[in-house]
Amino acid sequence: MSTILKSLPKGENVGIAFSGGLDTSAALLWMKQKGARVFAYTANLGQPDEADYDEIPRKAMEFGAEKARLVDCRSQLVHEGIAAIQSGAFHVSTGGVAYFNTTPLGRAVTGTMLVSAMKEDGVNIWGDGSTYKGNDIERFYRYGLLTNPDLRIYKPWLDQQFIDELGGRAEMSAFMTAHGFAYKMSSEKAYSTDSNLLGATHEAKDLEHLDSGIRIVNPIMGVPFWRDDCAVAAETVSVRFAEGQPVALNGKTFTDPVALFLEANAIGGRHGLGMSDQIENRIIEAKSRGIYEAPAMALLHIAYERLVTGIHNEDTIEQYRISGMRLGRLLYQGRWFDSQALMLRETAQRWVARAITGEVTLELRRGNDYSILNTQSPNLTYAPERLSMEKVEDAPFTPGDRIGQLTMRNLDITDTRAKLDLYAKSGLLSAGEGSHIPKLESDKG
């Protein structure tokens, strides 16, 4: 039996992820008038551009909802954000600047917590505002069914009758006004914004064109650091971790991770830290472009990775990065709670994060321009005396030890030279003159 309903299930309980915006307001009123019993669920994700969360359920009741609930998702969202930092679950980057998967993390929390709330109310049909071209339709589908295997999906934007009657924002506004709800459309921005406590995503409209960029964006979590009239003073910041958990900023200890994230957002936001422009591959293998903000995630990630490199050995760091890339892609695809993701995540949290205790001091300047000023940890394996260029007592190794180590390298050097000669004879490489190393055919000048 298909879990996706193509038309409105009249007379049944239908839950809708309700934002209070024009789209979901019109959808709720329309579904009510067409005979569904509509239940509205709003996720409090700490969106920086949301002024009054309590007003949203009240609006839903005015539009005809049988019940409207505000679900506080902030603690769970921060928990998942810290887990992503601990496991390096970020696979999209440009020039070394990462996208911190803030929207996928938000969908993982929203998709599970709202459907769980619906299930408590006996609601087993769920609708939301995601479109068929995007990632969210699949993310919500997966998380919804993982949470409630009896769930069925109804999306107004996949219902042809809804599209025919209310196919655009002008039609939705007229529909609301005609039924006594004066709904003035907000002025159209040059792009669309979606946000939560971890970060903001700006995309679509003018930002679909690569000749439009960050300069048309008005940040909601930071400052437009690229503008000459935007004053940004350098600031020294310290971040302390205890067994992989961020616990203090500038010497102030936080027992509430949400409060710590809010402060980290304020600190990083003053500089525009964590803003990036990315071209990424959507789940359906088509490319899209987004401009992102994530000041707290960026600040904590920088400090965390500094401690990782000072504490763990090269092989552990390599595995952390490889696994993090894979985990980031799984998170992006809506598979954050799949077994393969849990395996990668738990491994990093157990064997990498548990050792991360210490404090990193940085100087933040404009955008992603920063310097690391100090790194302290009782677990550092960085020991400068081991490699000091000065004479030290009780040196860990001697010139004679290094001669022996280099002599052992003759084994693989001899084997490598034999392989290069073999490749030259087979035509893969051009033979070098004298003792010159053979070259690839494409390297011959």
Curated annotation (Swiss-Prot):
Root EC class:
ligase
- For binding ATP, which residues are annotated in this chain's numbering? 17-25, 43, 129, 131, 136, 194
Q: Where is this protein localized, as stated in its record?
A: Cytoplasm
InterPro entries in the cross-refs: Arg_succ_synth_type2_subfam (IPR023437), Arginosuc_syn_C (IPR048268), Arginosuc_syn_N (IPR048267), Arginosuc_synth (IPR001518), Arginosuc_synth_CS (IPR018223), Arginosuc_synth_type_1_subfam (IPR023434), AS_cat/multimer_dom_body (IPR024074), AS_multimer_C_tail (IPR024073)
Which residues of this UniProt protein bind L-citrulline?
99, 135, 139, 192, 201, 203, 280
Q: Which reaction does it catalyse?
A: L-citrulline + L-aspartate + ATP = 2-(N(omega)-L-arginino)succinate + AMP + diphosphate + H(+)
Q: In which pathway does it act?
A: Amino-acid biosynthesis; L-arginine biosynthesis; L-arginine from L-ornithine and carbamoyl phosphate: step 2/3
Enumerate the GO terms in the molecular function aspect.
argininosuccinate synthase activity; ATP binding; protein homodimerization activity
User: Which parts of the sequence bind L-aspartate?
Assistant: 131, 135-136
**Which keywords label this protein?**
Amino-acid biosynthesis, Arginine biosynthesis, ATP-binding, Cytoplasm, Ligase, Nucleotide-binding
Q: What is its main location?
A: cytoplasm
- Signal peptide region: none
The record's PROSITE patterns line, in alphabetical order, gives: ARGININOSUCCIN_SYN_1 (PS00564), ARGININOSUCCIN_SYN_2 (PS00565)
A Gene Ontology biological process term = argininosuccinate metabolic process
| Record's GO cellular component terms | cytoplasm
The keyword Isomerase is annotated on this UniProt entry: no
Q: Which CDD domains match?
A: ASS
The family database entries (SUPFAM superfamilies) matched by this protein are listed as: Adenine nucleotide alpha hydrolases-like, Argininosuccinate synthetase, C-terminal domain
EC numbers for this chain: 6.3.4.5
State whether keyword Cytoplasm applies: yes
UniProt similarity note: Belongs to the argininosuccinate synthase family. Type 2 subfamily.
**Which NCBIfam families does the UniProt record give?**
argG, PRK05370.1
Could you give the subunit structure recorded for this chain? Answer: Homotetramer.
- From the Swiss-Prot or TrEMBL record, give the protein name: Argininosuccinate synthase
Taxon lineage: Bacteria, Pseudomonadati, Pseudomonadota, Alphaproteobacteria, Hyphomicrobiales
